[in-house]
């Protein structure tokens, strides 16, 4: 990269920085001070730069955006180790686990799915399919007919989205940041508590940070006042620019809370 400043041309490289100007001086790794222009350059060797770059890459790689699309989750998928942002390969991710891990994760997924409104799913599994077992399909067993599996094509949108969120929390690397778009989409409002409890439990157990978006006042009410420091809301100014605001910094928050819940504040267009 080259930067031209007044009469000097600065060339940036991973090993060195050269200053090519009137004097024709070269600068090698170390420290260079241009007192005339009040510029200080500190340069590093390649290993340090590569290590720093690797840390940045690892940080961004551990940011996972999840917006499950039930229509795509109902199809067969390839067995793979990383969950796609649309959740379409949930079954493949489960099948890629070791037999012990797969059994454990499926048991946990099943335990969190049971309280859903249908209350008839008692087990969720994923199985390889096809001649060479390279694809996978999601199945569940219901109380209505314990011997007859139901594949993903027979599951509701809310159930599939919920399963994708649970699988993501159970399989992403610790210390990841999981961004979930419309976290309660398709889920019955009466199960907001189960959703919040699941997010709190698994994020704490797996040491995963979770950032969710929602337009559901019921879910906001379920979070409770203790979560106010962790809630933000988005507004737009007269130019149409969006701004993220901390709820705890809202003016007259105590007065607003005295007249209703967080969800009620949203319904009344107070936030």
Regions found by a protein language model. Give the residues of each.
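C-terminal lobe/lid and adjacent interdomain/linker elements of RecA-like ASCE P-loop ATPase modules
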Residues: 194-271
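Residue-level preference for the first positions of well-ordered beta-strands
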Residues: 175-177, 209
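Electropositive, glycine-dotted interaction segments
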Residues: 1-125
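Conserved ABC ATPase signature
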Residues: 118, 122-170, 177-190
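Short small-residue beta-strand/loop micro-motif enriched in glycine and branched aliphatics
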Residues: 93, 146-151, 242-243
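Phosphate-binding glycine-rich loops of NTP-binding sites
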Residues: 8, 89, 157, 161-168, ...
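Short, Φ-rich (hydrophobic/aromatic) sequence segments
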Residues: 55-63, 170, 183, 197
